[in-house]
């Protein structure tokens, strides 16, 4: 994991810190379950607070997997196959990492029944070599957040987890939204200037990176998008 016993001595030693490019670690021990407080929230707050201490250097999440129920012989116990589990674990964790100034998210591992692609294990939710739901979740961030700088994003909807990004020359804005509820939302985006939506895709329990519905609000500075229940939706402007 990312433990203060290891990272603090480096951060607090000028000579060691000068030889450091990246602070990297894993996010086990329930990083996403901050509502329970205590140890989990303290770990989350510590890790997400690293950025302010790094003086322009970065922190990376370097390994995680979500495989609850894998040891059971009963398929009903294989939680990692369920869409709501994938969205509420991998999706939520990547979102929280992006909010916490993380610069790279690496999942372990790529081709495995609980990973990004199916394998020949009987527990695999998709055929060998096919992209699983976790793969589509990660691809939203790979396509819409890579090589960008995160910018502030606010939403009045507590169940709509949103991050926004801008490219290096400031000509392209992207938004990734996780709708963590049973209700569809007609979301109005407010980028602060006239824009054209050039791409909008959504992944749900039954769809993978399919075109999302763009809503014409009659205002080029406030484009709209329909965000389906329990979905991840990404928009490029």
State where each predicted segment sits.
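Noncatalytic carbohydrate-binding groove/subsite architecture in carbohydrate-active enzymes
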Residues: 1-90
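Loop/turn elements at helix/coil->beta-strand transitions in domains of secreted/extracellular proteins
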Residues: 18-21, 54-59, 100-105, 146-147, ...
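Conserved, mostly hydrophobic/aromatic
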Residues: 23, 97, 138, 175, ...
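Active-site proximal loops enriched in glycine and acidic residues that flank catalytic Cys/His/Asp
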Residues: 27, 63-66, 106-110, 177-179, ...
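Aromatic/acidic polysaccharide-binding cleft in carbohydrate-active enzymes
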Residues: 58-140, 151-157
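Carbohydrate-binding surface patches
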Residues: 155-195, 230
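Solvent-exposed beta-hairpin/edge-strand motifs
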Residues: 191-209
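C-terminal beta-strand-rich structural cap/linker in extracellular carbohydrate-active enzymes
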Residues: 214-237
């Amino acid at each position: 994991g990312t433990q203060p016993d290891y990272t603090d001595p480096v951060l607090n030693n000028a000579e060691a810190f000068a030889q450091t490019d990246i602070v990297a670690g894993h996010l086990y021990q329930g990083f996403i379950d901050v509502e329970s407080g205590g140890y989990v929230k303290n770990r989350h707050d510590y890790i997400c607070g690293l950025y302010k201490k790094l003086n322009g250097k970065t922190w990376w999440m370097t390994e995680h997997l979500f495989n609850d129920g894998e040891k059971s012989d009963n398929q009903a116990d294989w939680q990692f196959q369920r869409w709501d589990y994938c969205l509420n674990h991998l999706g939520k964790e990547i979102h929280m990492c992006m909010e916490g100034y993380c610069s790279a998210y690496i999942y372990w591992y790529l081709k495995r029944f609980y990973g990004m692609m199916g394998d020949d294990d009987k527990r695999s939710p998709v055929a060998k070599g096919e992209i699983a739901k976790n793969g589509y979740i990660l691809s939203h961030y790979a396509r819409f957040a890579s090589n960008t700088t995160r910018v502030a994003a606010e939403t009045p909807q507590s169940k709509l987890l949103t991050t926004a990004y801008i490219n290096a020359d400031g000509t392209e804005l992207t938004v990734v939204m996780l709708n963590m509820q049973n209700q569809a939302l007609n979301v109005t985006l407010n980028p602060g200037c006239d824009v054209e939506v050039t791409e909008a895709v959504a992944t749900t329990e039954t769809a993978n990176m399919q075109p999302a519905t763009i809503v014409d609000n009659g205002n080029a500075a406030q484009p709209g998008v329909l965000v389906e229940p329990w979905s991840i939706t990404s928009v490029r402007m």
